[in-house]
């Protein structure tokens, strides 16, 4: 595991063309713009957590895959490759890549919806940053579902051969994130009192950047 401040190509184990993409993404805004342009990984073959190399090749990603790519790009430019996990109740967790500017936290995020996106570096603490996702983070039953956030996890603690240069799913990353200390955002009493999304919010929440492709029926299938 490398503890270098700046990642070289050989540290990540990527090819020249792959590394060149990360070299071009030299600001958090450029990284976020790149993630916006990646299509959504709808996991047609089942649950996936594909390394950076596979995401660069496939040109699609979901949240943790985008967060790993963003963290790799930050590391290439001398910033620590930090992830933060947000736990939800009866809902999917969300993972973002963290960065700081003048002591304030921001987040780079890959999502297919309107809400759990980029956050400008204006948050004094990770709790503040996580709370910025609180109101819109809702499950399919329209209940606000965000409950916890984690300490930053430094991806340099895991061999880049697993999460950057690998070809197989990097399940060690979410497993290690699960072990990181998490902090509650609301008490149980507060959680019970949270309101559901109103009808207008539900309409907005239905907006998606990329539509799930329809499965093509083979000839003769029913």
Model-derived segments and their meaning:
Residues 1-222:
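A structural boundary/capping signal
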């Amino acid at each position: 595991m490398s503890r270098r401040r700046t990642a070289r190509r050989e540290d990540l184990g990527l090819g020249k063309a792959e590394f060149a993409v990360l070299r071009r993404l030299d600001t958090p805004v450029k990284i976020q713009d790149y993630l916006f342009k990646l299509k959504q990984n709808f996991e047609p073959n089942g649950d996936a957590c594909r390394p950076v190399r596979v995401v660069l090749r496939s040109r699609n990603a979901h949240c943790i895959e985008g967060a790993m790519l963003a963290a790799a790009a930050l590391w290439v430019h001398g910033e620590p490759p930090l992830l933060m996990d947000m736990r939800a109740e009866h809902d999917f967790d969300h993972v973002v890549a963290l960065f700081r500017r003048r002591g304030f936290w921001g987040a780079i995020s890959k999502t297919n919806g309107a809400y759990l996106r980029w956050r400008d570096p204006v948050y004094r603490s990770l709790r503040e940053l996580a709370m910025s996702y609180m109101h819109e983070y809702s499950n399919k039953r329209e209940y606000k579902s965000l409950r916890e956030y984690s300490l930053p996890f430094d991806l340099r603690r895991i061999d880049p051969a697993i999460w950057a240069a690998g070809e197989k799913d990097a399940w060690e990353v979410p497993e290690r994130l699960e072990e990181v200390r998490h902090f509650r955002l609301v008490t149980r009493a507060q959680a019970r009192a949270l309101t559901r999304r109103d009808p207008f919010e539900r309409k907005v929440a239905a907006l998606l950047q990329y539509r799930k492709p329809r499965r093509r029926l083979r000839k003769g299938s029913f």
